[in-house]
């Protein structure tokens, strides 16, 4: 009995025409608030009255209730949940070039991906580049080189958490009659839109670079030497700011 190695080499196409490909993909993300059973301003005020939140034996309790009652009669019914939202989308563009000839194989690709979140001013943009080169001599040597680069830039929405808007009262307006934002609303609740205009931000970016070189040397039939090496480089930066007014 004997052990051996059988090497099967696929016959390569000697020459191949240049190929160019382009792909565009996109999707739309529309917030759906139908699952929220949200009281309107009139029903919310009545619910609070039945719950005994207003002491009508005091002038303060009586005036506070009537103030909200008058606002509702004038049409006040703020849709707080829609305030920080927008329609988001994802757009992905990719282009590639490939070909082969005279023992050389090459591929180059570029990708740009833009993501706009459903929270206002939220985004994440990605750029990717890749290159592959390979040189092959039949039954002798194969050398290949691969390089990849990726860059990501992102920013979180300054509008805070969506849950902060869900608990707001619809009889409260976010702005006064002069268009100025109101910092504190009924029951000493903070206006979440105030934080969004303070200039707070949380953003960052990252970069990564990878180079890989590999080879295979067929010394004699059934015996070969191969090896590879990789160089990695990456960095990430984050930046945040919270205004003293927050």
Which residues make up each language-model segment?
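Residues on the lipid-exposed face of transmembrane beta-strands in outer-membrane beta-barrel proteins
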Residues: 10, 22, 95-101, 129-135, ...
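Outer-membrane beta-barrel transmembrane domain signature of Gram-negative proteins
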Residues: 70-98, 243-246
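P-loop NTPase catalytic cores that bind/hydrolyze ATP
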Residues: 217, 221-225, 229
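Surface-exposed loop/interface segments of Gram-negative outer-membrane beta-barrel transport/assembly proteins
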Residues: 14-76, 117-122, 128, 132-210, ...
């Amino acid at each position: 009995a004997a052990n051996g190695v059988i090497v099967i080499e696929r016959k390569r196409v000697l020459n191949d025409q240049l190929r160019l490909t382009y792909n565009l993909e996109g999707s739309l993300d529309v917030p759906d608030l139908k699952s929220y059973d949200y009281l309107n301003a009139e029903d919310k005020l009545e619910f609070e009255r039945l719950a005994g939140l207003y002491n009508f034996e005091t002038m303060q309790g009586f005036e506070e209730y009537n103030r909200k009652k008058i606002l509702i009669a004038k049409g006040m019914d703020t849709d707080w949940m829609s305030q920080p939202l927008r329609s988001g989308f994802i757009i992905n563009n990719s282009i590639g070039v490939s070909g082969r000839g005279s023992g050389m194989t090459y591929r180059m690709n570029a990708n740009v991906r833009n993501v706009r979140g459903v929270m206002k001013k939220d985004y994440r943009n990605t750029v990717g580049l890749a290159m592959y080169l390979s040189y092959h001599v039949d039954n002798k040597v194969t050398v290949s080189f691969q390089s990849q680069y990726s860059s990501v830039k992102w920013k979180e929405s300054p509008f805070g958490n969506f849950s902060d808007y869900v608990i707001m009262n619809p009889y409260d307006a976010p702005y006064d009659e002069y268009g100025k934002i109101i910092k504190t609303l009924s029951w000493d609740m903070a206006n979440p839109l105030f934080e969004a205009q303070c200039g707070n931000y949380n953003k960052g970016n990252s970069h990564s670079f990878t180079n890989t070189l590999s080879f295979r040397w067929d010394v004699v039939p059934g015996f070969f030497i191969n090896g590879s090496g990789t160089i990695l480089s990456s960095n990430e930066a984050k930046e945040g700011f919270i205004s003293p007014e927050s």
